[in-house]
């Protein structure tokens, strides 16, 4: 199921993340601090519950969920969103909705990397992780 995602991943490259955060509505100061952070992502599976934990000097966040079931999430920039995550062709697809807005976050394996693509309206950010 999601075994290919399990493990500890470290951020190695980030493209367009500031523009993405700006489109989401993240304030200037938070964008600057978050943009400099180099988070580790720890993904684990326990039965049918998947946990994604992000650890950085900026903030630690954790979500635990079952595929296809909506859940409440407080994001690293303190947005309160409704999220749903599905597995589509080997890609974890997360949709966050809040205040009439939505953003899509896709997590996929490419070779030995984990690629995270964040899309809000016409702005796309790509963040690449390698095993830690």
UniProtKB/Swiss-Prot annotation:
Keywords: Acetylation, Cytoplasm, Hibernation, Lipid-binding, Nucleus, Phosphoprotein, Transport. A fatty acid binds at residues 127-129. A motif (Nuclear localization signal) lies at residues 22-32. Induction: Up-regulated during hibernation in brown adipose tissue. The modification Phosphoserine is found at residue 13. GO terms for biological process: brown fat cell differentiation; cellular response to lithium ion; cellular response to tumor necrosis factor; cholesterol homeostasis; hibernation; long-chain fatty acid transport; negative regulation of DNA-templated transcription; positive regulation of cold-induced thermogenesis. Signal peptide: none annotated. The keyword Lipid metabolism does not apply. The keyword Phosphoprotein applies. GO terms for molecular function: hormone receptor binding; long-chain fatty acid binding; long-chain fatty acid transmembrane transporter activity. Coiled coil: none annotated. The modification Phosphotyrosine is found at residue 20. PROSITE patterns: FABP. It is found in: Cytoplasm; Nucleus. Gene3D superfamilies: 2.40.128.20. GO terms for cellular component: cytoplasm; nucleus. The modification N-acetylcysteine is found at residue 2. Forms a beta-barrel structure that accommodates the hydrophobic ligand in its interior. Lipid transport protein in adipocytes. Binds both long chain fatty acids and retinoic acid. Delivers long-chain fatty acids and retinoic acid to their cognate receptors in the nucleus. FABPs are important elements related to the hibernating state in mammals. Monomer. Homodimer. Interacts with PPARG. Belongs to the calycin superfamily. Fatty-acid binding protein (FABP) family. This is Fatty acid-binding protein, adipocyte. The lineage of its organism: Eukaryota, Metazoa, Chordata, Craniata, Vertebrata.
């Amino acid at each position: 199921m999601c075994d290919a995602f399990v493990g500890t991943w470290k951020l190695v490259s980030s493209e367009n993340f500031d523009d993405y955060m700006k489109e989401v509505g993240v304030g200037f100061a938070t964008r600057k601090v978050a943009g400099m952070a180099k988070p580790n992502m720890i993904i684990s599976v326990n039965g049918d519950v998947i946990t994604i934990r992000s650890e950085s000097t900026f903030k630690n966040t954790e979500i635990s969920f079952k595929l296809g079931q909506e859940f409440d999430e407080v994001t690293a920039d303190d947005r309160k969103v409704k999220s749903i995550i599905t597995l589509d062709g080997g890609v974890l697809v997360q949709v966050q909705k809040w205040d009439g807005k939505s953003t899509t976050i896709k997590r996929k394996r490419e070779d030995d990397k984990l690629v995270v693509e964040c899309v809000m309206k016409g702005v796309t950010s790509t963040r690449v992780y390698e095993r830690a």
